Curated annotation (Swiss-Prot):
Organismal lineage: Bacteria, Bacillati, Actinomycetota, Actinomycetes, Mycobacteriales
Active-site residues, Swiss-Prot/TrEMBL: 168, 249, 352
Pathway(s): Cell wall biogenesis; peptidoglycan biosynthesis
Organism whose genome encodes this protein: Mycolicibacterium smegmatis (strain ATCC 700084 / mc(2)155)
Cofactor(s) for this UniProt protein: FAD
Biological role stated in the UniProt entry: Cell wall formation.
Name of the protein described by the UniProt record: UDP-N-acetylenolpyruvoylglucosamine reductase
Main EC class the enzyme belongs to: oxidoreductase
Length: 363
């Protein structure tokens, strides 16, 4: 095994993956190689790719759903965690905890990442998904991303234009041929927050949408909002809050045409469901997936006590493991919710996490 000759790499056999994901579900991997430096990560990936070995690349485990039967595989654990600051630039290795990146930037008086506080997972995952929350996304501040192309072995920095960021996506999302090694962010050296675009957050801060304010105040407000929705990972193993055992929002907010939006408005009006929350989007109108889920009949906590997988009791868009769920349980619940929204509103929701070895069936 060529990878075993990469100095310092920890190799373990028969590794349960459930504790390494925020959903707390996963198979037992045949073996896992943990890379604590970028050099180790490059060496291992080059060696295993040359061996043509099937791999699972895992870092924070916060936005991935692993099939129950993915057992005969090798996992490469990304655990390089260095964060460096140079002027208004912050560089984070792929395995750094995302919230540590946010905290480090604020400690150096840099604004721009505060709206993304409390998001679980690693820095390397953020450009893959174009992670976002409360009116901000990492594409707003990323300046470049260091990548390893497993097909050629090339290690280089890619521009934001090459990454083709979109709503919760990038060119990196649907392939593991290119692996993120480091991410660089360009932030506000004047210590101002990013413009507060999200109405709920602006209200909590007492500012007008579009205003800037103290980024530490923004972080505090975001953490309060996220905690109230069960969207901050609970670290207490003895008294876990199962509402936090999730991948966050399971579905993205759909962007629809103006004609489809008017149709959804008519359906909601006829059902007495009230005004439809909506936001302008470059290609149409963005709808609130959580609102669609609840108005389609799937309230918080659905399907109720005793279910191994259910919607969070705090946030209808989070599908949660209540302690004993399997991936099959979660995917069945996701399929039921997706089919219900399609039936009521004619809108097909798109899953946000990466699904490995499991498929969300088309209703």
């Amino acid at each position: 095994m060529a990878s075993s000759h990469v100095a310092g790499v920890e190799i373990a056999e028969a590794v349960p993956l459930a504790p390494l994901t925020t959903l707390r579900i996963g198979p037992v991997a045949r073996r896992m190689l943990t890379c604590t430096s970028t050099e180790q990560l490059i060496g291992v990936l080059r060696a295993l790719t040359a061996d043509d070995e099937p791999l699972l690349i895992l870092a924070g485990g916060s936005n991935v759903v692993l099939a129950d039967d993915l057992t005969d595989l090798t996992v490469v654990r990304i655990a390089n965690t260095e964060i460096t600051v140079d002027g208004d630039r912050v560089r984070a290795e792929a395995g750094a905890l995302w919230d540590d990146v946010v905290v480090t930037s604020l400690a150096h008086g840099l604004g721009g990442l505060e709206c993304l506080s409390g998001i679980p997972g690693s820095a390397g995952a953020t450009p893959v998904q174009n992670v976002g929350a409360y009116g901000a996304e990492v594409a707003d501040t990323i300046t470049r991303v260091r990548l390893l192309d497993r097909r050629t072995g090339e290690d280089r920095w890619a521009t934001t234009e090459e990454l083709r960021f979109g709503y919760r996506t990038s060119v990196l999302k649907h392939s593991d041929a290119v692996i993120v090694l480091e991410v660089e962010f360009g932030l506000d050296a004047a210590g101002r927050s990013a413009p507060v675009r999200y109405r709920e957050l602006a209200t909590a801060l007492g500012v007008e949408p579009g205003e800037r304010t103290d980024p530490l105040r923004v972080r505090d407000a975001v953490l309060r909002l996220r905690t109230g929705k069960g969207m901050v990972v609970d670290p207490d193993p003895d008294h876990p809050d199962h509402d936090t055992w999730s991948v966050g929002s399971f579905f993205t907010n759909p962007v629809v045409t103006h004609a489809d939006f008017e149709r959804v408005e008519r359906i909601a009006r006829d059902a007495g469901a009230g005004p439809v929350p909506n936001y302008p989007a470059p290609d149409g109108v963005k709808l609130a997936a959580g609102w669609l889920v609840e108005r389609a009949g799937f309230g918080k906590g659905y399907p109720g006590e005793g279910a191994r997988a259910r919607l969070s009791t705090k946030h209808a868009l989070a599908l949660t493991n209540r302690g004993q769920a399997t991936t099959a349980d979660v995917m069945a619940l996701a399929g039921t919710v997706r089919a219900g929204v399609l039936d009521v509103f004619g809108i097909e929701l798109t899953p946000e996490p990466i699904l490995l070895g499991c498929v969300l069936s088309v209703p």
